[in-house]
Regions:
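Hydrophobic alpha-helical transmembrane segments and adjacent interfacial helices
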Residues: 58-65, 115-126, 146-148, 166-178
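Terminal transmembrane helical module of multi-pass membrane proteins
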Residues: 146-230
Length: 234
């Protein structure tokens, strides 16, 4: 028995046959002009979490790169955005992680974000110069830890690969020192956008006592439909 699900590709287009926990809070978007569709897609609450953090990280690191404002103001802005992102993550993902029995992943990410926030604020307000000079390294490292935990918890190869991407990006920042905040923002926000737009691999679905028998049966049928769709698409 393999640790990862070999029948699942690392990434692929989203499948329409969603489980109960994915249908909860599903957001569908369709933008069109007349009969011409500009964009059509759907986002589960997990996808919405990725989008939220993508906006937060882009806002933080692009502001640091392009706007000549004081470190104190930036610390306040970063703290506010990070707290909003952490709270939004908890609200959006709580039901999903409980059904999938991976609540510890949510707690892990919350701890990592708060740790990063405290260290960042201390580097600015307490004058921790060593930390201040390596804020990009810090956040890439913390994110890598979070992705590794997520990859192990969900048995997902893509999260482990993204974790490695963040980790190996740290030494590369020395080559783009004048643009390290922009580079960090692109890496972090880009990976989050990728995860929100595509379907990623994870372990096979599990039953949970939180769901009724009807919901469990619905999930089994959806799983069979996804497998059939994947087989026909080959």
């Amino acid at each position: 028995m393999t640790f990862f699900n070999p029948s699942e590709p690392v990434l692929r287009s989203k499948q329409e046959q969603l489980n109960v926990q994915d249908l909860e809070g599903l957001l569908r978007l369709r933008w069109q002009i007349g009969n011409f569709t500009l964009f059509s897609g759907f986002y589960t609450r997990i996808d919405q979490t990725f989008l939220l953090w993508g906006l937060v990280t882009a806002g933080i690191f692009f502001t640091a790169q392009f706007f000549p404002i004081s470190w104190t103001f930036q610390a306040i802005l970063w703290s506010t955005l990070t707290l909003i992102g952490t709270a939004g993550m908890a609200v959006l993902t709580l039901f999903w992680v409980r059904v999938e029995r991976v609540s510890w992943i949510l707690y892990c990410w919350a701890i990592l974000m708060i740790t990063g926030l405290v260290l960042t604020d201390c580097s600015i307000f307490a004058g921790w110069g060593g930390v201040l000079l390596h804020l990009c390294d810090l956040w890439l490292g913390l994110s890598a830890i979070g992705y590794f935990c997520t990859g192990l918890g969900l048995r997902s190869r893509i999260f482990l690969l993204i974790g490695l991407t963040h980790l190996f990006s740290i030494p590369l920042l020395t080559f783009v020192a004048p643009w390290q905040y922009l580079t960090t923002g692109i890496i972090m926000a880009g990976c989050l956008l990728l995860l929100s737009e595509l379907q990623w691999d994870m372990r096979s679905p599990i039953d949970n006592t939180m769901l009724s028998e009807e919901q469990k049966q619905f999930n089994r049928i959806q799983q069979q439909m996804r497998q059939l769709t994947a087989t026909l698409g080959k």
